[in-house]
Every structure is written in C-alpha cells, then in structure tokens.
Amino acid sequence: MSDGELVIEKGMRFDALLEQKCRDRAFGKKDRTRFLIMACVARQILDEPAKSPSIEAILDETGLSRGTFYNNFADMEAAMETVLSTFFQALWTNRPRTAPSRAGSADYDPVYEANLWYCESYETNAGLFAAFTRVAAYMPTLLRMRETMNANWVDRVISSTAKKRGRNFSEAERLTFQGELRLMVAMSIEALRERFIHCDELLSKSFPNAQAMAAGLTKIWNETIRRHL
C-alpha cells in the first residue's frame, strides 16, 4: 500500500479520505480491504478518542471476518499505529500545493500558511491528535516519526531564514535557533491540544477558529524568526 497516494484536502476528516481509497479501483483488493479497516479505526478514534477502537465494531460495520482483520493487522494496537502514522505522514509530506499566484503574492507568509494548514487539520481531526497523545508512550515509533518531522520543519525554517539574511548560521547560532524553534513547536502542539481537544475557555474566546489560532501562533513564530535575521 502506498501512503504517497494520500493527500488530506482542506477540511477533510481522515476517515473520509480512507473511505475514498477503499473504493478506488486503482488499488488492489488487499489494499482496499486494508483501507476499509483503517477507515473504521480512524472513525472510531475521531468520534471517541478517549476509547480504544473495537474489533467487534469494525467487523459489524464492514461485514469482514475476524480472520480478514488479522490477515491485515496483528492486533488493534498495530491497526491504530498504522492509522496514526499514515495520518501524520500524509499531514506533513503530502500537503496540497500552494497556487503559484498565491505563493508569489506580496502578503504570502509561508509560516502562516504552514500553521494554517496544521491548525485546520487539527480542528478537523482533533480525535487523532488526542489519540496520539494517549498512545505515544507505548508506541515509540510514532514519537520518533513526529520528532523527525518536527526536526525537518525546523531545518526548513532555518534554511529559509539563512537565505533571507544572506549568510549561513554559525554552528553556535544554528544550535540556538534550533532550540528556540523546537520550543515553538512544543508550544504550538500544546496550545492546539488545549484549544481543540480540551476546549480551553480563554483560548476558545481569543481564537474562535483555526484561522485565528494560526494567526496567533504565526505572530509568535515570526517574532522569534526576526531575531535571527
């Protein structure tokens, strides 16, 4: 199964994307069955993130046999790990491309666009992020994957900033900048968790939607970036 085929469009729940793929004849029967199971797992997580998905509910919904489930996944934990890792992989590596006219406009801010994409995805798929927080302690591969993606994002910001200022960072400057950006990543993750999972009252009033949340985070990100220009 190729995860590279998965692109999460604006406002799309991940289970809906997986359902599209399970009906896509471009994939073989085995892959479509796997997508079907994953869609059911994702839907259960999204609808009830505090609960572990149920194999029985999947079998009832799909009409598949227990043997078919176990032919695809060793157990429910493996199915959850696959769903979450596929979601984050699609979220970070297969973002819809920005239109060239938009990217070239004077008011285009790539940091805001990245934050907006992440905030909108978080708002729509909050249950998957909540489940990640719950299971990451015993699924270290998920944690390492997110750390790698965060590190890649930090490196892209540093490279972009170096181009704007016209010279590379020294080793000491780069280390300081990396540390500050990783703090920004951690702050953003926690802020989004409080806003969209725990529905913090003050954050909800101050940032009523994903667009407002992205603007608020971007302001802090850009203040940090400007100090290194």
Write out the residue ranges for each language-model feature.
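C-terminal peripheral helix-coil segments that are non-catalytic and often amphipathic
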Residues: 1-21, 158-163, 182-229
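Hydrophobic alpha-helical connector segments
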Residues: 6-7, 78, 82, 96-124, ...
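Amphipathic alpha-helical linker/stalk segments
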Residues: 21, 47, 52, 83-111, ...
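Alpha-helical DNA-contacting segments of helix-turn-helix folds
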Residues: 28, 32, 45, 79-87, ...
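Short hydrophobic clusters on alpha-helical segments that form packing/core surfaces
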Residues: 33, 37-45, 87, 91, ...
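Helix-turn-helix
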Residues: 44-78, 82
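Membrane-embedded alpha-helical bundles of multi-pass transporters/translocases
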Residues: 66, 70-71, 84, 88-92, ...
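Amphipathic alpha-helical packing segments from all-alpha helical-bundle domains
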Residues: 93-95, 120-124, 130-133, 140-167, ...
